[in-house]
Amino acid sequence: MAQVLRGTVADFPGFDERADAETLRKAMKGLGTDEETILTLLTSRSNAQRQEIAVAFKTLFGRDLLDDLKSELTGKFEKLIVALMKPSRLYDAYELKHALKGAGTDEKVLTEIIASRTPEELRAIEQVYEEEYGSSLEDDVVGDTSGYYQRMLVVLLQANRDPDARIDEAQVEQDAQALFQAGELKWGTDEEKFITIFGTRSVSHLRRVFDKYMTISGFQIEETIDRETSGNLEQLLLAVVKSIRSIPAYLAETLYYAMKGAGTDDHTLIRVVVSRSEIDLYNIRKEFRKNFGTSLYSMIKGDTSGDYKKALLLLCGGEDD
């Protein structure tokens, strides 16, 4: 049965954008800032509602809400609030643009977003990217990456994955055999074969291929990728496989490793929590609890502090005991 996806943030009932705009203005006016009011209000409104508040704020006060928030807040808390204020349809495109901009490429961001978004989502991202930045996402990716990693990204950006339909067992067998021949049975690796199969077959078909692969080879496909590839390509192929198996489980793992060990990858923490808060953050929480023996809520609690922590916990939407 298909998993029902649930976010942790939804439209606020009885929403009044003018009242909210006034509350925010009061929280930032004069000496000192009432961070508590700002974070409580913004985390309990949907992204569409936050956009309406920004319009009302400008209408009532002739001021830009985002500029005011930026000048009143600092550090990670500011970054989180700024992310919440970005229109959701722009957010992924914005993150990709910044991953490609300037010296060095942030492959981690490219991999995470491009591997875990559906073909429909990717098409929407590409359209917004072009409207906002006046260049094609695919061209920018090609200009900033190379080799098989680049080719896999380009295949995914075509967003031409087969739609889910009745599974053809003969084709499943053929693909599983082809992957086995291209990796474990070959001196060297036929990366092209992995790229084509992973990038174009339907999700339900690939799940069967992974099971069949295990039967034929005695290995999980992840183990083979680990042995046969390396670097950015390995990370991308693994992200694709994990997303095919379960997007919420893949993103739960992404969050776990953003916080595990010394230091926290706050950029990833903010990006995943904000971008999934209205899509599947509830499912991500459940997978997190199941796979890591602790809850997302308690890990955020132990890993962050101050208003930043309070806001993240409100977005997380509850504890999973």
Swiss-Prot record:
GO terms for molecular function: calcium ion binding; calcium-dependent phospholipid binding; heparin binding; phosphatidylserine binding. Annexin repeats lie at residues 15-86, 87-158, 170-242, 246-317. The modification N6-succinyllysine is found at K290. A motif ([IL]-x-C-x-x-[DE] motif) lies at residues 314-320. The keyword Glycoprotein does not apply. InterPro entries: Annexin, Annexin_repeat, Annexin_repeat_CS, Annexin_sf, ANX5. The modification N6-acetyllysine is found at K70, K76, K79, K97, K101. Pfam families: Annexin. There is a cross-link at K29 (Glycyl lysine isopeptide (Lys-Gly) (interchain with G-Cter in SUMO2)). One of its GO terms (cellular component) is intracellular anatomical structure. S-nitrosylation is induced by interferon-gamma and oxidatively-modified low-densitity lipoprotein (LDL(ox)) possibly implicating the iNOS-S100A8/9 transnitrosylase complex. There is a cross-link at K29 (Glycyl lysine isopeptide (Lys-Gly) (interchain with G-Cter in SUMO1)). This protein is an anticoagulant protein that acts as an indirect inhibitor of the thromboplastin-specific complex, which is involved in the blood coagulation cascade. Monomer. Binds ATRX and EIF5B. A pair of annexin repeats may form one binding site for calcium and phospholipid. Belongs to the annexin family. This is Annexin A5.
